């Protein structure tokens, strides 16, 4: 990983799967499990082949997954390493020119073939924003470095991480406070119903957003004010729509926090008796 050892990649593939072809099949199975729709592998080393391809987006997804492996993460964040080869020490230097040079960079990998030209995937973290930058097809190392630095600095200068889950839930809490008598529960023994989000449907807790769009995030709550009893806890009663500029919008179900039973004959009898004895007392 540090010095693009294609021979090591082949040795590992043959040891694990018996052949490059078998190992490539494992790679493609993993790609499918990660949801990579524009990637196909024919080798572990990535040398040019018509059927060996990927995209910048898929490379970012692969990198995000790979960085969850502590050993991989440590290797790609290592600038140099001494190895002992038959008693002779040899220093391996990481080919990632941004490692140790640009603030926050902690990996990941350079690449070059005649068909792909100069490529670089970079992982960089500053404060609470952690990004993966991918540049492909650069003519020179200088272009690769310059483009990566420009992209990384642009993101950190123009984007912030916001707690979208907390924003949604705060909005729903405010709605509950301001709409105490919103619901009419037909034949319900109570009219007091509170709502909350179905948390499992919120796709992410945080999202990076352009600073100019933070105030433009729109959250709308849509619920039916008329509901027939009984109402069970966790019953879907509406939706909250979230529109994020320059990002995919999504919706989350709103569910009831409490249950409300339906009025039955015993309820009416009880009310009748209460009214009757109240009149007698009066």
Regions found by a protein language model. Give the residues of each.
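Mid-domain, small-residue-enriched loop/turn segments at the edges of structured enzyme/sensor domains
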Residues: 13-64, 71
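Domain-terminus/edge residues, biased toward the C-terminal soluble/receptor-binding domains
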Residues: 36-37, 51-53, 57-282
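Short helix- or helix-capping micro-motifs
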Residues: 1-4
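Acidic/histidine-rich, surface-exposed loop or edge segments in extracytoplasmic proteins
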Residues: 6-10
């Amino acid at each position: 990983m540090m010095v693009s050892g294609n021979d090591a990649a082949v040795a590992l593939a043959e040891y694990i799967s018996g052949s490059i072809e078998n190992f490539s099949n494992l790679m493609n199975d993993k790609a499918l499990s990660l949801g990579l729709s524009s990637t196909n592998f024919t080798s572990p080393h990535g040398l040019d082949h018509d059927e060996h391809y990927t995209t910048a987006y898929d490379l970012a997804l692969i990198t995000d997954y790979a960085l969850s492996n502590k050993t991989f993460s440590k290797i790609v964040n290592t600038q140099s390493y001494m190895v002992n080869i038959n008693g002779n020490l040899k220093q391996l230097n990481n080919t990632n020119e941004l490692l140790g040079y640009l603030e926050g960079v902690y990996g990941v990998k350079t690449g070059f073939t005649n068909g792909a030209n100069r490529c670089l995937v970079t992982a960089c973290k500053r404060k609470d924003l952690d990004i993966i930058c991918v540049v492909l097809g650069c003519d020179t190392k200088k272009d690769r470095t310059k483009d990566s630095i420009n992209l990384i600095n642009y993101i950190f200068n123009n984007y912030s991480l916001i707690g979208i889950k907390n924003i949604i839930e705060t909005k729903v809490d405010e709605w509950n406070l301001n709409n105490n008598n919103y619901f009419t529960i037909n034949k319900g023994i109570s009219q007091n119903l509170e709502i909350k989000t179905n948390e499992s449907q919120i796709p992410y807790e945080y999202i990076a957003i352009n600073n100019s769009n933070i105030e433009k995030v729109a959250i709308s709550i849509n619920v039916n004010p008329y509901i027939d009893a009984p109402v069970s806890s966790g019953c879907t009663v509406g939706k909250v729509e979230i529109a994020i500029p320059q990002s995919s919008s999504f919706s989350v179900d709103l569910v009831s926090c409490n249950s409300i039973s339906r009025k039955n004959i015993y309820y009416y009898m009880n009310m009748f008796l209460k009214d009757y004895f109240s009149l007698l007392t009066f």
